[in-house]
Regions:
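Polybasic/polar functional segments that serve as interface/processing modules
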Residues: 2-124
Length: 124
């Protein structure tokens, strides 16, 4: 998407905006298979994704993290220009427990499963 913004002297310049999540057909979704301290930010979640999950964040994949109370979830991804962090807190209900029967450090979800999960569905 290209938009214009005012520039000094009244001239306008066009700036390209990066897509929120580029090339969705090639993006993979990984979920941490244990609860995460929701106080963690960019660096803490990046470390979990690379060290515990063994994945490279800068490929552009999505990384889902859920807090112990299951009221909050965060999604970390790299959009090509920097790290992005989405944070959702449910006003009622709980997110599904991804770590219920997991034997691995992470799970791989489809994009549809991620969407259902973030909407509060138990279908995972």
């Amino acid at each position: 998407m290209v938009r214009q913004r005012p520039y000094t002297g009244g001239a306008y310049i066009a700036i390209a905006e990066p897509a929120l999540i580029a090339q969705l057909s090639t993006v993979r979704v990984y979920a941490m298979a244990s609860s995460v301290d929701m106080r963690k930010g960019f660096e803490g979640l990046y470390a979990l994704a690379t060290q515990q999950m063994g994945r490279e964040v800068l490929r552009g994949d999505l990384f889902l993290f859920v807090g112990q109370t299951r009221k909050r979830a965060k999604v970390l991804y790299f959009d090509g220009t920097g790290l992005c962090l989405l944070h959702k807190r449910l006003s009622k209900g709980l997110f599904a427990a991804l770590w219920r029967d997991s034997q691995t450090p992470h799970l791989e979800l489809s994009q549809t499963e991620l969407q259902l999960f973030l909407e509060g569905s138990e279908a995972i």
